[in-house]
Amino acid sequence: MKATLAAPSSLTSLPYRTNSSFGSKSSLLFRSPSSSSSVSMTTTRGNVAVAAAATSTEALRKGIAEFYNETSGLWEEIWGDHMHHGFYDPDSSVQLSDSGHKEAQIRMIEESLRFAGVTDEEEEKKIKKVVDVGCGIGGSSRYLASKFGAECIGITLSPVQAKRANDLAAAQSLAHKASFQVADALDQPFEDGKFDLVWSMESGEHMPDKAKFVKELVRVAAPGGRIIIVTWCHRNLSAGEEALQPWEQNILDKICKTFYLPAWCSTDDYVNLLQSHSLQDIKCADWSENVAPFWPAVIRTALTWKGLVSLLRSGMKSIKGALTMPLMIEGYKKGVIKFGIITCQKPL
């Protein structure tokens, strides 16, 4: 979601499980955040596509665009141009300054690259073209363009975000390397095999059809290209478990109404979807502890005089978002919400 320091060696990498109960059924309820209507669906664990009506999907796109049209300016004013979580040391009790939290957001990018295996000069040289799927106001794109000297293209549903991202690229003398446009992640306007790095930093949670989302990521990846998905998920279901507990789903439904998150899935679901495309080096990790300090920091910022004034000026969507933040913390603490990374490589 475009809203966001552990000893790297302490992180657990989980390869995909061939004995997963991929295919067992669970029931989901998709509530369109822009209306009181709901669409009842049945999905499978691993096949998590949401069979929403076309009108509901269009309402979702419009809702996401309007949400970020309204809230992105507030986020940039308070937190800067990286609209994603920071990466912290687990159980850190240090009260970081604003600059410390912004450094943690940069670390999130670096840790994601490290986890995906983009760690040495030889690997970095291979990255010539990057797509940032759900780019926000382009913080990741501009960082990656500078780091790799690569051509980066960011896509977002929000015209306000796309314009601001292009303006910032021009201001930072990066317009020749980083460009941004309004486009749908489920129907990307790019030819097959275009990008050496396919980057999705906290955008997957907005996708109503996870299978189509993954299919598009794979389609636009070049042979040998890396795919990095960093996203909010719900916990993995245990063996024999068909669905989340009702109280768990209730928390997710409330968050969905504010942040336009139509279909939660688990990291296991993502792994199985990627496995179905015969990708290589599929791995995932739970980084929930590494992002735990972030939402309390957002709340503390919102409760400052500057934060309150900015919230009121930004509008009702921002205010609703601030009021929903405690639910994110509750979900994390109760183990319902997980912050996951899933990476893989497309075969040559």
UniProtKB/Swiss-Prot annotation:
Gene Ontology cellular-component terms listed: chloroplast; nucleus
Protein location: Plastid, Chloroplast
Catalysis: reaction(s): gamma-tocopherol + S-adenosyl-L-methionine = (+)-alpha-tocopherol + S-adenosyl-L-homocysteine + H(+); delta-tocotrienol + S-adenosyl-L-methionine = beta-tocotrienol + S-adenosyl-L-homocysteine + H(+); gamma-tocotrienol + S-adenosyl-L-methionine = alpha-tocotrienol + S-adenosyl-L-homocysteine + H(+); delta-tocopherol + S-adenosyl-L-methionine = beta-tocopherol + S-adenosyl-L-homocysteine + H(+)
Keyword vocabulary terms for this entry: Acetylation, Chloroplast, Methyltransferase, Plastid, S-adenosyl-L-methionine, Transferase, Transit peptide
Region of interest called SAM motif I, as start-end residue ranges on this chain: 130-139
GO biological process per UniProt: methylation; vitamin E biosynthetic process
Changes seen on gene knockout: Slight reduction of fresh weight in mature plants. Leaves with high levels of gamma-tocopherol and absence of alpha-tocopherol.
Miscellaneous comment text of the record: Seeds overexpressing VTE4 show increased levels of alpha-tocopherol.
Name used for this protein in its record: Tocopherol O-methyltransferase, chloroplastic
Annotated source species: Arabidopsis thaliana
